[in-house]
Amino acid sequence: MRYKKTLMLSIMITSFNSFAFNDNYSSTSTVYATSNEATDSRGSEHLRYPYLECIKIGMSRDYLENCVKVSFPTSQDMFYDAYPSTESDGAKTRTKEDFSARLLAGDYDSLQKLYIDFYLAQTTFDWEIPTRDQIETLVNYANEGKLSTALNQEYITGRFLTKENGRYDIVNVGGVPDNTPVKLPAIVSKRGLMGTTSVVNAIPNEIYPHIKVYEGTLSRLKPGGAMIAVLEYDVNELSKHGYTNLWDVQFKVLVGVPHAETGVIYDPVYEETVKPYQPSNNLTGKKLYNVSTNDMHNGYKWSNTMFSNSNYKTQILLTKGDGSGVKLYSKAYSENFK
């Protein structure tokens, strides 16, 4: 549907599930770049802020999945700190004041070029000004308190810059006057990250802490044989993360070096997808899964890889049977599940 340069739109707030982002809006995209990981953002594969940064700016832990859908608020200093300095004297040319001035002046092309196309100097552009549908979804998020503290306030009412098919338009939310200043509270992710995905759906320092490993004769993590792990999950925790059909799951066994902050093995040197054996003797409120690698039939690939480097650890990732769903990670284990 075509609409005017200034679109008077009073968005009706309906249920969260009734809206979805378009096909180019990646719900699995990872988030943000950390300045300490991406000093030279052009050469780094660690291009985005991890979930910990979302928590720092007021994102509720209950809605961290929305952290993969919205970039840092443009009012935050960390948004501008991600840009490298471009002046010989080290002065920052991309600032909140400059951003606001271009936005209020209607200089959208330069705003796009300097702050969005260039964001973190990605060779595959991943960020964009939201579309009208995305603004509508963000308004729904905000009214349900599912964004950061800053964005929950920003999206309640206002006039928002949108872009669709190369065309800029203004969307009015909440019946605000036409002379209300235009806002662009956040840019959004429109596709997956180039190269490796360095940050995924895991909460730093809180990577599914309710997994119990039955050690001893039931579980085994030693050289020269298959890894066997009997894992106990809390059913309420699984349900909280969208796992209602506890039989429709799969596991990946990952080997590599865990990330220093999150403990997640983002770039495994070995991975193996396995279907678990599900014993029937579950305790009330608990779910047991028996996960094992296929070493005896594939030349001990897991064992040979795991114990080829003293820095390597093994981590077990739970997803839904088709690989979708929130990614639930175990601790990364060394020998004997230590």
UniProtKB/Swiss-Prot annotation:
Transcription in keyword set: no
Task performed by this protein: Involved in TCP pilus biogenesis. May be a channel protein.
Lineage of the species this protein comes from: Bacteria, Pseudomonadati, Pseudomonadota, Gammaproteobacteria, Vibrionales
Key word Thylakoid present: no
Organism: Vibrio cholerae serotype O1 (strain ATCC 39315 / El Tor Inaba N16961)
GO cellular component: a single term: cell outer membrane
Keywords: Cell outer membrane, Membrane, Signal
Cysteines paired by S-S bonds: none
Mode of membrane association: Peripheral membrane protein
Superkingdom classification of source: Bacteria
InterPro entries: TcpF, TcpF_C
Protein name: Toxin coregulated pilus biosynthesis protein F
A Pfam family that the UniProt record links to this protein: TcpF
Signal peptide per UniProt: 1-20
UniProt subcellular location: Cell outer membrane
